């Protein structure tokens, strides 16, 4: 089985990402974010383990790819879980990708990415940091094993100062939980050097909703009807009503406009709100 795969193999009509590949050096994720979707399709999704024969498989896959699309690390895990500090699987994969001449997109919640700046600044690269809140108490409950938001913001600044384009994913937005932080997150991201914001609303699946019920019962009581009575269903996920999603995303878009950042939404079906050529920030990759 390939480890460097086509992104979005299900061809979801709501996915507007440009063509790219996806590589997950690890199966599962240690960050244990309550809202995470991977537990709906990865057994033991919060148990992080290295892929077997990873480097051999990456080398073989890279030789077979004939289109120089970006390689995204990672979409079903974080490429910088705590164990990466010792194992260095992502770092080795980056070396292999660089040797093969592919551009790369990093998607992470970890400041450990700054360890690899020596490699990344020599590659065609864009780094995307997910920041859902600036409140360390909320973050520690919502994303218990991820680095706190202040460390992520420092990493945004550090990566940006090396001349590497940085985007921030405000993802997910929760009504009644983190929505009051929208404007401040965008402002702080801009101050730290981010160039683009990708935003998305919380789209619970059965397992992630149950985790939220246990950790944030008041939030779930307030929003249950929004998701399950007047909201929409898309495959196994629940969506807020389109009018509320548009309202939240317009706030992000307006905040971006005020500080000079581009904006896009993710899997919302509202591409008309986007102000960037791509939804994922890969338009920021340097020309070869």
Where are the model-predicted features located?
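Surface-exposed amphipathic alpha-helices with a cationic face
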Residues: 95-98, 121, 156-162, 253-257
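Charged helix-capping and loop-helix junction motifs
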Residues: 87-89, 150, 180-186
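Conserved radical SAM core fold
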Residues: 72-81, 111-114, 127-146, 173-175, ...
């Amino acid at each position: 089985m390939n480890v460097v795969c086509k992104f979005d193999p299900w061809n979801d009509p709501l996915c507007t990402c440009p063509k790219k590949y996806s590589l997950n050096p690890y199966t599962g994720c240690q960050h244990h974010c309550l809202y995470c979707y991977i537990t709906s399709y990865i057994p033991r999704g919060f148990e992080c383990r290295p892929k077997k024969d990873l480097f051999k498989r990456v080398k073989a896959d890279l030789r077979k790819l004939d289109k120089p699309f970006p390689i995204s690390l990672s979409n079903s895990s974080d490429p910088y879980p705590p164990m990466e500090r010792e194992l260095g699987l992502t770092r080795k994969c980056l070396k292999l990708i660089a040797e093969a001449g592919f551009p790369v997109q990093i998607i992470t919640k970890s400041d450990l990415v700054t360890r690899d700046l020596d490699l990344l600044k020599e590659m065609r690269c864009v780094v995307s940091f997910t920041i859902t809140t600036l409140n360390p108490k909320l973050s520690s409950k919502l994303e218990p094993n991820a680095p706190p938001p202040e460390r992520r913001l420092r990493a945004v600044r550090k990566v940006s100062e090396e001349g590497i384009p940085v985007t921030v994913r405000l993802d997910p937005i929760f009504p009644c939980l983190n929505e009051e932080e929208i404007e401040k997150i965008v402002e702080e991201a801009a101050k730290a050097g981010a160039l683009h914001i990708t935003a998305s609303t919380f789209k619970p699946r059965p397992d992630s909703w149950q985790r939220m019920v246990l950790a944030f019962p008041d939030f779930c009581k307030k929003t249950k009807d929004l998701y399950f009575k007047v909201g929409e269903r898309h495959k196994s996920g629940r969506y807020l009503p389109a009018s509320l999603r548009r309202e939240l995303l317009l706030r992000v878009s307006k905040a971006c406009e005020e500080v000079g950042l581009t904006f896009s939404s993710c899997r919302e079906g509202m591409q008309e709100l986007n102000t960037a050529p791509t939804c994922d920030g890969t338009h920021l990759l340097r020309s070869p």
